[in-house]
Amino acid sequence: TGWRLGLIFAPAVFTAQLIKSHQYLVTAANTMAQHAAVEALTAGKNDAEPMKKEYIQRRDYIIEKMTALGFEIIKPDGAFYIFAKIPAGYNQDSFAFLKDFAQKKAVAFIPGAAFGRYGEGYVRLSYAASMETIKEAMKRLEEYMREA
């Protein structure tokens, strides 16, 4: 399903192994996908810029709001996720903290412990939602932290 078209940039030392799986995921690309790839690689260089700016705005808004509440955050430069340390003085059990938050404020984050033992005490959230949704989630988080 989907476009089934892919491109890998990797150090030569890895390509021999990568090609073993990559070739089966993207071979026999349909004509429409091939034309789309040509367009993207020749004329689409800046197509993602408006969305990139939007994601940066969302990320920075969340970081500002959450750090003001005491969360520790290392600013992400990759995908659209934030991994934030739960402030001292709050339940450090990420599952318990977020279960209570979800029950009281109807907002879902992912417990850091879901990513292994070193994730305990952290929460993960996505900023792939609209700014309106993000603002509402941050408002509810602020209310929750004040009430806890």
What function would you assign to each model-found segment?
Residues 1-148:
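PLP-dependent class I/II
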